[in-house]
């Protein structure tokens, strides 16, 4: 009886441990994005750009900033070399999936040191069993009460 109980306990423990490690698809996307943000903060260029799909696009806060991965990497390279990159702390993330579960889109709020509160949104594609960032869009949300003034400044620019 004691031996049977031990075997049963070991099996239940193994099952519980494997269930605890299993991530939902949304958690898996979150882990990819978290690692991507952490790679930027650590100035780990290879890890950071390894998260992009080959035909990925990064859109920055300026209207002129629509970069292919190669263009974005060229712009960012000096920052990674100097170890003076950026730190984004994500929260309030939402993830959705296509019906075939091969495409995911998300939005997240970001606490940043330089820009304050930002929003990131984007699309990931499943490629060879790995989620890759196909598009990322960084924006600075403007409170509605300030929009008119900001629009005037943009027009005057």
What are these regions (language model features)?
Residues 1-9:
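Bacterial N-terminal signal peptides that target proteins for export
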Residues 23, 28, 58, 71-117:
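Surface-exposed, charged secondary-structure patches
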Residues 34-38, 58-65:
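Second-shell loop/turn segments in exported
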Residues 36, 48-49, 56, 72, ...:
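Hydrophobic pocket/interface hotspot
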Residues 52, 110-112, 137:
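Short beta-strand segments enriched in hydrophobic/aromatic residues
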Residues 67-69:
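Short beta-edge strand/loop motif at the mouth of beta-sheet-based domains
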Residues 117-147:
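Short beta-strand edge/turn micro-motifs at domain boundaries
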């Amino acid at each position: 009886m004691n031996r049977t109980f031990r075997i049963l306990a070991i099996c239940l423990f193994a099952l519980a441990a494997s269930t605890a490690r299993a991530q939902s698809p949304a958690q898996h996307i979150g882990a990819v994005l978290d690692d991507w943000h952490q790679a930027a903060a650590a100035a780990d260029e290879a890890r950071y750009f390894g998260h992009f799909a080959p035909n990925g696009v990064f859109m920055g806060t300026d209207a002129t900033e629509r970069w292919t991965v190669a263009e974005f990497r060229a712009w960012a390279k000096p920052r990674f070399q100097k170890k003076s990159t950026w730190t984004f702390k994500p929260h309030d993330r939402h993830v959705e999936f296509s019906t075939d579960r091969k495409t995911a889109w998300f939005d997240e709020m970001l606490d940043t040191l330089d820009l304050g509160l930002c929003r990131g949104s984007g699309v990931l594609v499943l490629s060879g069993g790995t989620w890759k960032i196909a598009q990322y869009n960084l924006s600075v949300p403007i409170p509605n009460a300030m929009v008119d003034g900001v629009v005037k400044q943009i027009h005057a620019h």
